[in-house]
């Protein structure tokens, strides 16, 4: 097992991302957020955009999982080989890519993207939607599979009561006991994180519940108003 991946075992990975038009959308702000998460015990950081990757890599000592989002529909998480290579150049230790079977914007297959990355020694995290995605990702050489895309819509559109896809984590771990399966998506409480780890997750990614104050505030406002 690669030592960087081994370093993530049993850890919480903080996803530090701000969306277009939000007050926190600035590389230095995200770097400060990432450093704060590291001080709290985060064992890794997931972040979006070349400037954010570079800034966070310069401020933290834990592994950085980089993505480059292009748009908001279809395959938009690191959708092409060009995007993936740019994330590596920006400093990402691991590159996460959409690993669903949807058409990719450059017309290539997922394997067309993963193969050259692996030849170049890049660690690849497959953002999956189904167990079939996970099977395919491991079959073509992806190093990590995650449940990132097993839920519809953006994470910030989920309510606090929406939980992670623990069933998919459990199924993937049962089929691939020696492979790193990471739980990501709708991990909103410490109990959610524990449930994912109890299901066998290699690590758990937590984003909105740690690093998106607008959503966190709205949860309190909604609860207080009832």
Spell out what each predicted region is:
Residues 1, 19, 23-24, 165-226:
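Alpha/beta catalytic cores of nucleotide-metabolism and tRNA/nucleoside-modifying enzymes
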Residues 19-24, 71-77, 101-106, 132-136, ...:
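Short, small-residue-enriched loops and turns at beta-alpha junctions
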